[in-house]
Amino acid sequence: MVGLHFDRGPVKHVDIGWRVPNLLRELLDGIGKEYSLQKCIPITVLEKVLWKYQSIDNVAALSGKEYSRVQLCGPKCAFRILCNIPSDQLVIPDIEKYNEFNVNKTLYEGFLLALDTIQHTFNSQLFNDSPPHELNSKAESSVSHTAEDYFDSYISNFSRISETNLEKLHSRRELKNIECDAKKSLKILNAYDKLYDDQLDELEKKLEDIQYKQHALRQKKGTILSTSEKLNNMIYISKQSRKNIEEVSLLLKYDMNKKSSSVYSGWETTNLLSKSELAFGFNENNNNYNDDSLGEEDANDESENYDTFNLEGKNSRYSGSSVDYISEDTRQQKAKNKHEIGTVLSALKNAHENNITCLDFDEPFGTLYSAGQLDNTIKVWDLSSSKFIGSFNAHLSTINCMQLDTQQQIIISGGRDSLVRLWDIKKFQDYSTNYNDIENYYEETNCIFECDSHSDEISSISYDNFNLLTGSQDKTIKHWDLITGKCVQTFDVSFYLNNSPPFENKFSPTKKNYFAHSEAPTIGSLQCFESALASGTKDGLIRLWDLRSGKVIRILEGHTDAITSLKFDMTNLITGSLDKNIRIWDMRNWSLVNSYGYQSPVWSLDFNSANVVSATGGKTSEIFRRKENNHCIPNENYSFIKSEVQFVKYKEDWLIEGRSNGDIEILTI
């Protein structure tokens, strides 16, 4: 290698590329050992050049995009140094291509850019002609600024720079500083530009996701609407089919009554409609049937083809598949073709030896459960055929009250033996035409639950959603949880009744006491719904309880004697009493809506939205039309009947009466 020597002339500015610092380090470490470069070039000059390129203030050492002018050697010396650098290391890469492959800024670079921006904004706000006492407040307020605030302040600072002012400057140093600051700011702006591009991409993706979710929700909403329409159609078809089934059952019922003798002694079979009469109409002018009506033999042939069907979860042994009927008429309108409201469809003669104390049934044309005084059994009847199915020993003494739950397929009974029992009636609900061994099927082990905490006879019960309320002559009301089988709370009403007058049997015209006990019931009636309980006691007061707190929240006054029955719906509460009055209360404002009296005490009542039916010890049930606000007299002639109506049960336009002689009658209203 030929030795190099320095020119002794004046030192000039030499442009050295951005890779010179590394090359000089290699020259000092490697090349100088093998060649005589160190001998030709003073070591102090090389150290100064290397130190210059390693300086923090050197922009070329940091970025490599600018050239540095140094005053360390002449141009010939610099040329000789560059000539000894390998040619492959002299290639300067394309900065634009380099940036294409390194588009994303590192976290450190972004932090430096943000730090420069914050520092620049902080200084501009802190020292912008502010007095000393305001510096601390401005410094504290600047800390809470967001990156967007710094960016806006950063842009506003450069917007105030005028190009005309730059043209007036003649200082190279100031122009150089402004140029460097502008290039740094340009880097920061490029970083912000990339940042905002990324944020815009994220927002576009979020908008796409939102649009996709919106489309999916609209599809689900459309599915819900279409499914709702299908369900509404199913409900409509189910109601129509149910009406058709009930109409066919009614036709079969009338046909059986036509072929048999009168079910009630002294009544003529002409009082009952036949299937032909309903299907083809009746001529009132000549009291004859139409010529094209079905004959009795045809009816027998068709009745053999009926299969089992299920009506609202209740089993019946009749179904209509080929019987002609008038589909636009309801079963009430069919009965009105010849009979008025109150027509007796059938009767169960001598169902019990003594008066009926309580009954309940599965409507329509389902199963009837009844109990009588001095009879410890519950008897089961088929309403479609008026046949006796069976009975079971439910208590040790008279049964005072019962309630049927067809969904759970249980019946709850309370008796004078101070016991409340729950019975499984699934066997009776699914009975076949063979009635053998059904009566023997029920034994003591078929009682699925027994409440034995009362010390006196049971006078009333109420069941709703696994909550059972029992009222007793021991002046207590007990709340039972049937899931756990435990008594959860007891309401003592004895302190309410201390001043009540003793019951005197002076209300019945026949001087008979229809109660199973010798005096008016202490707790005459109960009804619960969820956490609400209504109770009627012999002091003539109706108390409304909150089962959650166990306290009386309201008392309704108006009756002057013992409450015997009560029932409420979502709007009204109707009560009956031994004071011969029935009162209708509005549960929305607890005001008395209507009140009407009878000549005898009210022993039992039931109602729906159209009628209020009550038993007042007369030969017929009392029917009060709620909309017309008048009483309805049944069409049947009861002048020859000596028994009195003691208990009524009214469901879906079907009324069942329990009489004092043990008979049970089924009527349509």
From Swiss-Prot:
Function (record text): Involved in mitochondrial fission. Has a partially redundant function to MDV1 in acting as an adapter protein required to form mitochondrial fission complexes. Formation of these complexes is required to promote constriction and fission of the mitochondrial compartment at a late step in mitochondrial division.
Organism: Vanderwaltozyma polyspora (strain ATCC 22028 / DSM 70294 / BCRC 21397 / CBS 2163 / NBRC 10782 / NRRL Y-8283 / UCD 57-17) (Kluyveromyces polysporus)
Protein name: CCR4-associated factor 4 homolog
CDD domains: WD40
Coiled-coil positions: 189-222
GO biological process: mitochondrial fission; peroxisome fission
Gene that specifies this protein: CAF4
Spans of repeat WD: 351-391, 394-433, 453-492, 516-557, 558-595, 597-634, 640-669
Gene Ontology CC terms: mitochondrial outer membrane
